[in-house]
């Protein structure tokens, strides 16, 4: 099945024992006879609104691997793989300014805004960089070759063809890409660590594990790794570029608004009064939340962070997005051999103008 509005169809394989599958899934009607594909899909996904399935079947939106259109009378076949378009959730309108930083026949680089997810996930399907770009560029083959957190802005790279995907993804997997981020946070409180980050590059090495269902990552510092015989798997070079006075209580960041955002007054660490620092972060690995977790470990969680040091209610705050931007990306083009240097034009809201 082709994409629809930039969104891929979803595959689902019918289980060998539909009754057991319905029982495990907690269906409202686990013992209902399953004679047709429609019977199973209604019982499994929409027992209280079967019209959703029957309407899809009438529109020819549920098909087999070979493109055969299923109907309400199509018999249930264990092991059959079917394809369908997911029901899209109601999504708030997110920023869609994705200026092109670089493009050739193999790859497209854009400057992602804060709050926009890279790919469909959870509550966001249409409102993602991938979906928006597939529609805008008219290219259903676009695929990101790396990821940025939804809250992070900056340089984001997409492969434009199927052969290019493997080449660029391998480049990232082999750590052949130079990456540099900018962040705003409080100065590191430990005098020795702060002095190291001011005079040169402070290296942070930890072990990071992302547990399914947990919002924050689990992290072990170097002494903990040594005690528990764990291997560090996350390394970041941290440099403080400058220290400056934090804005006053009436400061309003010059940050674009977006429809559907819910603002809360003090996301992440408080930023009024005292001092802030501009950090240059160079990750040598690519673990989930690595930069956010490493600055939190140093006692300087990134301003605007709603996950570290503690999880806050999920809400977008356009006046103070996470103060983290993927600022630079450099690599040797795997096809042309050209040295490609990309730089984000995004500005962090808390930096002095």
Q: Across the structure, where does each feature detected by a protein language model lie?
A:
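RNA pseudouridine synthases
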Residues: 1-353
């Amino acid at each position: 099945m082709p994409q629809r509005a930039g969104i891929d169809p979803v595959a689902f394989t019918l289980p060998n024992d539909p009754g057991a599958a319905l029982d495990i899934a907690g269906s409202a009607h686990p013992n209902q006879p399953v004679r047709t594909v429609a019977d199973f899909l209604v019982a499994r996904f929409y027992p209280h609104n079967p019209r959703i399935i029957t309407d899809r079947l009438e529109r020819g939106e549920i098909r087999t691997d070979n493109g055969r259109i299923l109907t309400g009378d199509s018999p249930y076949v264990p092991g059959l793989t079917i394809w369908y378009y997911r029901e899209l959730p109601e999504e708030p309108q997110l920023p869609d300014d994705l200026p092109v930083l670089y493009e050739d026949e193999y790859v497209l680089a854009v400057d992602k805004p804060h709050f926009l997810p890279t790919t469909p996930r959870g509550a966001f399907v249409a409102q993602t960089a991938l979906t928006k770009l597939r529609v805008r560029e008219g290219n259903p083959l676009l695929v990101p070759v790396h990821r940025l957190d939804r809250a992070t802005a900056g340089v984001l790279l997409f492969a434009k063809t199927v052969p290019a995907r493997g080449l660029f993804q391998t480049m990232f997997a082999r750590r052949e890409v130079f990456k540099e981020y900018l962040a705003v946070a409080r100065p590191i409180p430990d005098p020795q660590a702060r002095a190291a980050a001011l005079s040169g590059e402070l290296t942070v090495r930890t072990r990071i594990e992302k547990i399914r269902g947990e919002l924050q990552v689990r992290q072990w510092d170097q002494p903990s790794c040594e005690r528990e015989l764990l291997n560090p798997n996350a390394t970041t070079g941290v440099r403080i570029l400058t220290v400056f006075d934090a804005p006053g209580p009436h400061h309003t960041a010059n940050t674009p608004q977006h429809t559907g955002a819910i603002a809360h007054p003090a996301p992440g660490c408080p930023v009024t009064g005292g001092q802030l620092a501009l950090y240059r972060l160079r990750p040598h690995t690519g673990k989930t939340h690595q930069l956010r977790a490493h600055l939190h470990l140093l006692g300087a969680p990134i301003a605007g962070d709603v996950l570290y040091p503690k999880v806050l209610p999920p809400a977008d705050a356009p006046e103070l997005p996470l103060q983290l931007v993927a600022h630079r990306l450099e690599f040797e083009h795997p096809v042309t051999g050209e040295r490609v240097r990309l730089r984000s034009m995004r500005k962090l809201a808390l930096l002095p103008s």
